[in-house]
């Protein structure tokens, strides 16, 4: 397996010009595209329609090149968007290609990617053990597809799935189905948490008996160390992208991960880069930073609003949601190390690392 990685700048949620140019020059074979992970400039909430616009724009472009309908493109390629480019974060997409490769095997394991898609998640299943189990099954599928046999070789599992919307709440009401909440934005923690627990269950990080209906989005001491989950109203299924290093892969990249102990943890950023194989002293030089291909992180407000003993207003600000504060802060910290603000930073860390902490993964050139 040979995985390709291309970072695409976007001037607007509907801008697909950089991918169009790569296809035109032959740098990217559209038939090898398997996934796209990106940041759009919406609010990141239940009413963020920039994610759907971005997906449709890429689907329309690829439909022309693949001879498929936009809907068929969506079934063939996983699109994962996180809304919210606060602070220095730059709207962009990271494109992944995958193809068989009979070339010489590298001495070390290289980047591998597996994808798993769940069935449709009913509104009443959002944020429940049914969602957990569905994601765990998709994780098993993705592991097999990536050719990874040891969960320890997995460094990043990105999951995007549905949250509740007014329309899906109304659908559940018509059927008399019970929901975890009636608040669309309030359903995000439940959805993100259930998906993260699905990753933990699928990778064997957590035993099944520890996951019960009443602990989802409540008992944060149960978590995955490599899950990164996002929820949006544009999806009905959960899409699982599993990244790790596999012996049979011939990619030109490696992936590693670390933990951000809080929103200003520079050491955690460097930990992820070194885990991926980037060698540097202090902070990466400009030349070394060019070897960093992509960084993916989660962001969270400090527990009780206090950051290293100092009071913050992240949790008490009535004008700006704490997730937006956190994304802006974490994005700036990471960019100060990598020198590139085109970073995937997503808010909300329910069951994703220990309370107050957040996962971070990095892809570098091998």
Swiss-Prot record:
Protein keywords: Hydrolase
Molecular function terms from GO: hydrolase activity, acting on carbon-nitrogen (but not peptide) bonds, in cyclic amides
Leading EC class: hydrolase
Active site: 160, 230 (nucleophile)
Binding site for substrate: 51, 82-83, 192, 230-231, 327, 346-347
Segments for region (RU B): 110-247
Region described as RU C: spans on this chain: 253-366
Superkingdom of origin organism: Bacteria
Sequence similarity: Belongs to the cyclic amide hydrolase (CyAH) family.
Entry domain remark: The monomer structure is formed from three repeating units (RUs) that share the same structure as one another. The monomer and the active site possess nearly threefold rotational symmetry, to the extent that the active site possesses three potential Ser-Lys catalytic dyads, but one of the 3 active site surfaces varies in composition suggesting it is involved in conferring substrate specificity.
HAMAP family per record: Cyc_amidohydrol
Protein's UniProt name: Cyclic amide hydrolase
